[in-house]
Amino acid sequence: MNTVNKPFRKKDAMQLVTGQPVYMDDLVPADCLIVKLLRSPHANAIVKSINTAVAKKVPGIEAIFTWEDVPQDARRYTQAGQTYPEASPYDRLLIDRHVRFVGDVVAIVAGKDDKCVDKALKMIKVEYEVLEPVLDYHTAKDNPILVHPEDNWESLCPVGGDNKRNLCAHDECGSGDIDAVLADCDVVIDHVYHTKACQQAMMETFRTYCSIDLYGRLNVLSSTQIVFHARRIIANALHIPKSMVRVTKPRIGGGFGAKQTAVCEVYPAFVTWKTRKPSKLIFTREESQIASTPRHEMEIHLRLGANKDGRIRGLDLYTLSNTGAYGEHGPTTVGLSGHKSIPLYSNAEAFRFTYDVVYTNHMSAGAYRGYGATQGLFAVESAVNELAAKLHMDPFKIREMNIVHEGDVMPAYYGAVNTSCTLDRCLAKVHEMINWNEKYPRRDMGNGKIRAVGMGMAMQGSGISGMDVGSATLKVNDEGFYTLLIGAADMGTGCDTTLAQIAAEVLECGLDNITVFGADTDTSPYDSGSYASSTTYITGKAVEKCALKLRSQICKLGAQLLDCSENDVEFDGKTVFTSADPSKSVSLGDIATASMFGHDIPLEVTETHMSPLSPPPYMVGAAGVEVDTETGEVKLLEFDACVDCGTPINPNLTRVQAEGGILQGIGMTLTENVTYDQRGWPMENSLMQYKIPTRVDVGKVRVEFENSYEPNGPFGAKSIGEVVINTPLPAISDAIYNAIGTRFYELPITPEKIAMAVAEKEGAV
């Protein structure tokens, strides 16, 4: 292959590294209205009265909007960017009189500059009827205090939700008699695993600019992963026709799932629609910490049964998920905690997976890389590591005995067949990379320092089977260069580049010969959006189909110009020539020119792709740590990983994706945490309190690939974006156990917890 599986530089690399104006705030006019939000100081309250009269008199203030400007009996909406029919409940109003978490919106203020808006915010007088909040998600279900007591709460899908029970979603599924199987097992690992909420903490905070175009339509420029869903969400929130909304995206400074929710778009959109003046809203870092969409806090009760020889026979998993004040992504993230963890051990005789998603008066949770699988894999893989220790077996060996293989049916993965898999080879590769036999389980280095290793596996999916849609439009321009129009959003992942590589491979041209444009709801073909690990697998396949069809059209017009049958010509990327006589040819440039006059064969093609399958990528990771038993400090000396993502379209970008995801998983394991005080106030409201790891906080990170070939993906590709975050959690946790002999069932594992565990073990506590 000429371009696929080759390490091309990102198409936008030079623009980004030289600081060119490519992000939202670089592109908006300086004289637009500044929009800011007044937020609730209470976790649960009713706005009894709100006085904006004095604030409106501040010079420069254009408008102030409150719940009185939003019909409270109107149909609600969700800010979750999801494919139809939208699993997340319609439980929001643009401004609700009932505020449900600390940071919920009370008023929207718009003015000519920051100074006047900040002054006006301080002058708004609000009287609240403070209500008792639901802050413990263990007691939320069937609690007499309702987070959503309203009657116009609406669930579009049968997800088991009931707002009068504080229940966002509920389901259960299984195969076989799990209770009988577990009763017959020699060993049962039975624990509750707790993963806290954590923030995506992308460099670029939430931001949106809105204006009215010459047709009177609302134009929205937003840092979003989901332009088409954002259009629907804005229209629903403002109760205007979708045809009156256009959404485009600039370059995005990271998202990791946060921007799969329309966190900020509706507020400047409302201001601009009402005032007919351009406006922008840029979240501060504090706002992005206290009023965004962090990962769902989950508690997972897992029972895992096995025989004495290490054969895993059954898994019983119950997940309790805290969706917070609103239900964005609540019904969908929770499913992955079981459906993307249990299938790793599909040879088990039985499984059961049950879950509840509950409302609380915490910040609304949402999408974050891994999307529920991360939490479930921490539980399942930690249990398998504990099983190995209990049976005195090597963690690699016990997995070799039990893992899913290519061709296996996966009952817990909706009964799908595992169409491509090199998980066994990934295990062998990581075993070799970290030099496991020499380092496992621990080495005492003296001076209270112990080095140890641990490992874990992961799987994810490639898009949402039977639902996600990706589309692409390809056209030949004069002189024979191509334009690729996509609806997927490049969030810094390089999807513009990888999709162009797929097209270039089919069309046998150089990568620079393809310009990429996206995403714009007016001009791009429909795409579900850049989430669910779908871009390469779903949109990439649409690009491949589109390029093949365009290639056929080029040959058809070329044959017409050569006065012969289409079956008698070939195309080498530069010319169309007759098979019998290659000297009889016509250049691509001449074909492009001919398409513009006197011919009716179009050189513009649009193709759409939907896959009934979501083939899992797989990953194995191993961590080497050094634990200081006196201070509890953990140094990550190395992390070695091997990924099966099918055919990597661009190995450089694929490796960078893996390295970034691993770092995020390390943070979730050791430092990152979202906590609340007794009033429901978020404690980590800046990056001083919310500790994300930097590159200097970790040692060597090495990533290799064991390529499978996925027959349903473009050139054999599967996804890469999410699976990479999942293995650090069980791997580092097990390494710490091997170092100090104490297992941790709650994340993050902080130095304080480790020091206390060591002291307790030594009898000091």
Range-by-range predicted roles:
Residues V147-L238, I403-F481, P612, M683-D697, ...:
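Helix-loop-helix junctions that connect adjacent transmembrane helices in secondary transporters/permeases
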